[in-house]
Amino acid sequence: MANAYDAVVIGGGHNGLISGAFFAKAGARTVVLEARDKTGGAADTSAPWPEHPDFRVTTYSYVMSLMPPTIIRELQLERHGYKVTPFGPYYQAFPDGRSIKVYADDANKNFESISQFSKKDAETMPAWDAWLSGVADVMGPLLLHVPPKVGSMRPSDLIEQLRVVWSARGLGVRGVGDVTRLFTMSVSDLLDDWFESDEIKAMLTINGVIGTWAGPDSPGTAYVMLHHSIGDVGDGHLGSWGYQEGGMGGVSDACRRAAESLGAEIRTGARVARILVRGGRAVGVALESGEEIRAPVVVTTIHPQIAFLRLLDARELPGDFVRDIENWRTRSGVVKINLAISELPDFIADPGKELQDHHTGSVELCFSPQYAEEAFQDAHLFRKGAERPFVDGVIPTTLDKTLMPEGVHNFSMFTQWVPDDWAEEPHRDELEQYADRVIDLYDSLAPNFKASVIARQVLGPYDMEQELGLIGGNIFHGELSVDQLFHMRPAPGYADYRTPIRGLYHGSSATHAGGGVVGIPGWQAFRQAKRDRMVSRRAQ
């Protein structure tokens, strides 16, 4: 006999847990189903080395910024363990013995650091920050908007389109032009318009290519930079990032505790085999175990190509929607490298193994925009792992003492690129050789680095797809290209967190605002169900 609930949420990552928490808060009898033996998805903390059971790392995602305060506040996540500490400067050491540091909160230090390379760029930096902040002030709130059905003439849809236009009224003529450029330009071209020094451009390139199957010369990467520059961690500095205490699994744990405290049931080891549909409406799910769970509301927070192409019969969906999901681009060339190191890097540019501010922030490996472009072309054009990989690295244990025993640090490296078809097979030997190159490059900048490595974990696109269901290894559930954003994410007419099946809602990162540990998609899926009066009367 089937179990009955008011709402079933598929996927126990942060979006699923947040969606389940809001349903439970509304009084709905809610169950969240996670296929793995633990919740969290990519926001996970693990102990990957059996020989070092007390060494913990943030497995996949690694830093926090983009979750809106309204979600944190309404679910009281801080009460349940959400605690983010802003990290230090963006730091890049260069082979010539110089380095650059860019702070979120210290314009004077930025001027001093950038002046080594270009006084003109140092003078330009405040104007750049002001310009980007101005655009972000208008665009940031759009993350909380439900995308309208552009082109629809239904009165309700026209009203939603007007609301979006009205929300952007502060841009002005010049601002609209700026936004157009951000959505269409490459990050390289945009930075060339502002700066002359490759060193400062290298530092700013980072946010334009994180997680993308595109190099800095690719159109649209300027938007990716904006996406990563519109959050904060409650410190009042736009674009700041931070470390969650206990690693990113601490974020998921806080979401899980919040959901459970509100009455949601969380089940792990519960893999969904089918979404049950009767007469064009969702009525529940069937698990691989054979168990059926009935509910008038089903929310999927897993990858859309799994949810719509594997868990549903294509005959239950419109043909154009199926084609859009089949053609959804979800490529990646990301490799996550987790290291345990016995001492902090002793950089030639900034000597010393003792803790310094440059250890506490983002420790980059990108010497110029061209460096990043060559790394991408190695994977894209020459179909090999980058000879000189691009790295966004952090050492969270400099500020979070809960992850490792005293005297040991975790260096968490988000690296790019390897060929996108490495998602199809493990490529274990090639990945280890790629990781060797990353370590050697850091060792050339900090000669104690290679010898300090105690243990390492190397995770490629195949691991991300097999373990997390991230098709292609794409951390965003789909590329952040201009044709896969806002009202096009994941398909025209279905960007409002609804689907062609009544009662089935979509709250994965493949919807608007997705990309990063944001939580907005799961929250919006709940809100749409509530608007549709799909949350049971008992739950209201």
Describe the residue ranges of each PLM region.
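Flavin-binding catalytic cores
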Residues: 318, 344-345, 379-388, 427-466
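Mid-domain catalytic core of redox enzymes
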Residues: 241-245, 271-404
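Conserved FAD/dinucleotide-binding core of flavoprotein oxidoreductases
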Residues: 109, 116, 249, 305-310, ...
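A glycine-rich dinucleotide-binding beta-alpha-beta segment and adjacent secondary-structure elements
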Residues: 197, 201-217, 383-394, 448-512
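A conserved FAD-binding loop/helix module that cradles the flavin
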Residues: 507-530
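N-terminal glycine-rich phosphate/pyrophosphate-binding loop and immediately adjacent elements
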Residues: 3-151, 480, 524
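Active-site/ligand-binding neighborhood in enzyme catalytic cores
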Residues: 133-262, 269, 470-484
